[in-house]
Structure formats: C-alpha cells, structure tokens
Amino acid sequence: MSNEAPLLQLENISREFPSAKNDEPLRVLRGLSLEINRGESIAIVGPSGCGKSTLLNIIGTLDQPTTGKVTLVGQDLSTLDGNALAALRNREMGFIFQSHHLLPQCTVMENVLVPTLAHGQATAADEERGRRLLERVDLGERLAHRPGQLSGGERQRVAVVRALINQPKLLLADEPTGALDQATADKLGQLLVDLNQEENVTLITVTHSADLANRMARTLELLDGQLA
C-alpha cells in the first residue's frame, strides 16, 4: 500500500453566500472533509443545487471557502495570493466545462496551446505534446481546422487536450458530456477514463450522467452540502 501523501485534502470546508432576505446566510457546503490521491478518477453527483459546482470551484481555486482548509500537493491554498493561485492553476490543473470555450478565430493547435502562453511562447516540446495528444484523440488531421469546422464532440475533445497540455496533476470537469448526444458522450467518457490512466492525472468530474459516473473509480454523493 502506498504511503504517498494525498494529492488533495479538504478539511471542514463550508461555503456560505448572503441570502436575498439578508438574514441567515445560504449554506451551500457544510463541514465537508475529503482526501483524494494521485491518479484517482472521481465523480461528484447529487441533485441540482446541492453544491457540486461550488465544491469543484473551491477545489479549482476559482472560489474560496468561507471556513476550512484546502491543501494541494502539500500547499495550503489559503496562504497564496491571487497571482500565486493563478500560477498554481495553470501549472497543476486543467479544466473542462460543458461549453468548450474554444477561441473561434484560432486553429485547433492554437487553442490547445493557449495554456502554455502563461509562461511565454509555446515551446517545441509543447507543440509536440499537443500534436501527440490530438492524434491520441483522433484529431491528428484537424490541427489547422478552426472550431467552426468541427462537430460538438470534436470540439470537446480539443478542450480535453487543451486541459492536459501543461501536464496537470488535477483535471477538473464540470458536466463535460452535458451538451453531447448519448453516443458522443459515451466516447468522451471513455476517453477521459483512458487519459486518466495514461497521464496519471487525477480526474474529478461533476455530472448528472449515471453513465459517466459509473466509469469513475469512486463516486461521491452530495446532499444538502454534505457528503452522503
């Protein structure tokens, strides 16, 4: 059994928002604690409004908990300022959303390389990795195409490659198959599982899809802001 420290630790995480009536705050997450190891694949499921996306945003440093502590690769994220958090996100994390957010004026390869520009110009090694990953997802012949020339499933595969280009330790996906038809969603779900294993990247996906959740090694159910 491995003695390696968890990649990600959440300790007593709560998230509150001001309520419309300005009395009791709206409690979205309530005292949630969790450990996630390197290379795991995890689905976060639960009814709408239970806090799934809020939890994913806190893990991805796009939101801050009201109380509690988040530790990633041994670093207490509350000690980092905005610039340091942005650098950590770019270095350690990749994001996939229901909408691909590709730049329509850029080619497939240019879109894939966007995250590498945070540290200057894309290198030859970046381009080679992008080319290899695009070939891996069956888009090796589409490098010079623009998003408008691709199907919905192809665009989402480009978004997956873009999320992996910087070799992140953590891949966060928010309803990645939500806008796809069933056949395309099935293929993308299997691709995510395969890449999770091939890249040894920890995959955390928020989903309403039972099919996608069943492909993950572990499923976490949120109910009323707590793990069920």
Residues covered by each model-derived region:
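ABC family nucleotide-binding domain
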Residues: 5-223
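Conserved switch/coupling elements of ABC/ABC-like ATPase nucleotide-binding domains
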Residues: 224-228
